[in-house]
Amino acid sequence: LINRIVKCFTRSSPPKKIKYDIEVMNYFHFKGKRRLAQHWQRRILYKYGCDIEPGVKIHSSCIFPHPVGITLGKNVVIDENVKIHQNVTIGSSPLKSGKELMPKIEKNVTIFAGAVIAGDLTISHGAIIGANAVISRDIQAKSTVVTAKPTILT
């Protein structure tokens, strides 16, 4: 833990620092130190503009190339070698059954800027989620999801 806290204050790049901050926040969360976990959550929010809930399960190989504006819900599961770009939201859909149903992101997935992934769904391994895509159902392995073609209205 001390090693991770020290790394949070070093001169390493923001993509590395945010991972250390998340690890420290989750350490406090899973040890039952709620106030310390909330302090670290606010630190992440102020430092990077990212709203990451304590309890998110992120593999250590996950990459945040531009850690700005990312929102991750409490029980989101993110496997190894996932790349999450800026302004991505991963969380629950509106409550239907009274439980928050969170997405699971499998390994080797790339999520580009502005994507929204919501609900009880799985993004299977090797999938690519394009910029500004809105995902509300399961995505098959090695699929590419993009938004529709832009339409000029005037």
Regions found by a protein language model. Give the residues of each.
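Left-handed beta-helix
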Residues: 48, 54, 59-60, 65-68, ...
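Hydrophobic beta-strand-centered segment that forms part of the acyl-chain substrate-binding groove
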Residues: 97
